Amino acid sequence: MTRVILVQDVNGLGSVGDVVEVKAGYSRNYLVPKGMAVRWTEGAQKHIGDISAARRAREAAALQEARDIANTLTKEAVTRELRLAANAGEDGRLFGSVTAANIAKVLSSASGHKIDRGKIEIDSPIKTLGEHTVKVKLHPNVKVDINVVVYAE
């Protein structure tokens, strides 16, 4: 058995920074050549520990920023203003659709924060007038539901 330090998450084995014991062949032929792990030494353990500490600090800062943005988005003043104008026929169907990019643009201007369109989760583009609920995934642990009102121009 050989001790290795994981530098990537490996299903069924562990996450980044974990010290695990694996068979020598698995380490030598798979984990180390693919860059998923490094051989365990005291120096490598200290180096990975430093990297992990820096990563945890970055993740904590990203989580706090996501929570701050979520607080801004859930304020009534921001969500009340989230209205999108679109060209529509008399039956209430849009000529075209409202996409995540359109929602991100309006949400960014209403909140004052840069919201990437990849963070907007909609099942399919919105093609009807009315109120629709959209999820905004700011962080894996922070999601916000926003009501989007689409009205005819």
UniProtKB/Swiss-Prot annotation:
Keywords: Ribonucleoprotein, Ribosomal protein, RNA-binding, rRNA-binding. One of its GO terms (cellular component) is ribonucleoprotein complex. GO terms for biological process: translation. It holds the Pfam family Ribosomal_L9_N. InterPro entries: Ribosomal_bL9 (IPR000244), Ribosomal_bL9/RNase_H1_N (IPR009027), Ribosomal_bL9_bac/chp (IPR020594), Ribosomal_bL9_C (IPR020069), Ribosomal_bL9_C_sf (IPR036791), Ribosomal_bL9_N (IPR020070), Ribosomal_bL9_N_sf (IPR036935). It comes from the Bacteria. Gene3D superfamilies: Ribosomal protein L9, C-terminal domain, Ribosomal protein L9, N-terminal domain. The keyword ATP-binding does not apply. Signal peptide: none annotated. GO terms for molecular function: rRNA binding; structural constituent of ribosome. PANTHER family: 50S RIBOSOMAL PROTEIN L9 (PTHR21368). HAMAP family: Ribosomal_bL9 (MF_00503). Belongs to the bacterial ribosomal protein bL9 family. Binds to the 23S rRNA. This is Large ribosomal subunit protein bL9.
